[in-house]
Amino acid sequence: MGPDEASTLMQNSRAPISAPAKEPIPGEVPRHAVFLPDPSLHHIVIIGGGAAGLELATKLGNSLGRRRKVQITLVERARTHIWKPHLHEVAAGTLDVGRDAIDYLAHASEHHFRYRIGEMIGLDRSRRQVHLGRTYDAEGEEITPARSISYDTLVIAIGSTSNDFGTPGAQEFAISLDTADQAVRFHQRLVNRFIRAHAQAGPVRLGQLHVTIIGAGATGTELAAELHRTTRQLVAYGLDRIDPEEDLKITLVEAADRILPAVPLRVAEGATRLLEGLGIDVRSKSRVVEVRKDGVQLSDGEFIPSELVVWSAGVRGPDVVRNLDGLEASTSNQLVIQPTLQTTKDPDIFAIGDCAYLVSPGETRPIPPRAQAASQQSSHLHKQMKRRLNGVALQPFVYRDFGSLVSLGKYTTVGNLMGAVKGKGLMVEGYFARFMYESLYKMHQMALFGLWKVLLLSMARSLTSRHEARVKLH
């Protein structure tokens, strides 16, 4: 960062809090109904209820909303929150959304912020208004109209989506695991395919119970291992006309020269050996050029017959990033931000989590889109928001990489924990790695509920889990 950029950054972070957002021009017919907050309170609007957005809303509500220092509004299109690293378990059926989801409306009421259902479709920076699109129910009936929300400080935390790179057929015939709804939809299709194969008169045909997972990052690799376990559990439940060794096939396809390209080589090699030992077909250096209704076409001409295809490759920001009134975006469609987490074009707008693009000073690569980065940015911005309200210069965010952990279902957990010395890491696996992996979710829960409630939830979970099915059938 040059001297001029640093000077601008410090001026922006010391800038006084902006005046209340502009009201509609008298006589003008607005395109949206406009929600105007209490003018006596600074209004913080958070778009997106993922890990970063919900943790920030909860912390701000507990510290500032409780004392009526600010007004906080969280906007999210979903009704409930599921920790995104758990979506592969939802897809496999080993995690029950109905039991583990957090209801936004109830959580907001308990933690002194407001929840508004909606999805951002645009932004007017001059009036400081976020435009929300209409929402509909499953029958196509309108739930909420198009409207706008005025803000004094805007935090964009809309996460990321998988990137199909324009591959023909990917959107039509592959399922992504970006949301809980998508994960539930995949699980329902999986169970239905098993029931159909069990009930049919003839034998299982080629490709009928084949699942191809495109992208062998953490999500794809974890899903492959989890599916191996749950598909055999479905057979054990009574769908015994299916032979899990002969009829079931899981193929994991990765364009890079190995799976888990973001983790150390030895961790990836260990995961590959385990997956192949389970009978999972691991294909590295394999590029998908087309997804069809009945399978996947590779660049080398091979066709993989598949009844279900999951696309978990690539990461990019949501399409709406390109429609945010001139905010700077990266080639991966993420919002470019400064070390203070402010966007480069507007000091009143922040971005955190997967949708944010930040290259830390002294680094050459951006902060990776991981849950630990989202949580760290949420905690940092919570502290900085108090400084902002008091007109004090904002401090830069410093990312700490604690390593990567990959859960391979009940079989094992592997990973690399970063030490105090940069670049040095400790490879872990087995029970200790599993404990560390589960601790990541406990930390997310503690950010939302506090230590004592998490302890009570854990105790209740251990008492009820023995009476529940290992795999959901609905």
What are these regions (language model features)?
Residues G2, A6-L41, F113-H210, V310:
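FAD-binding core/adjacent interface of flavoenzyme oxidoreductases
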Residues G2, M10-G122, A218-V263, V310:
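Beta1-alpha1 glycine-rich phosphate/pyrophosphate-binding loop at the start
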Residues K69-Q71, H111, Y115-R134, H228-P339, ...:
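A Rossmann-like FAD-binding core segment of flavoenzymes
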Residues I47-G48, I156, I214:
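Conserved N-terminal Rossmann-fold NAD(P)-binding element of oxidoreductases
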Residues A6-R31, P39, K383-H474:
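C-terminal, flexible cofactor-proximal segment of oxidoreductases
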Residues I72, R370-L389, L405:
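An active-site-proximal "capping" alpha-helix that borders the catalytic cofactor pocket
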Residues K22-H32, E172-A201, D294-Q297, F303-L308, ...:
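FAD-site-proximal beta/loop scaffold in flavoenzymes
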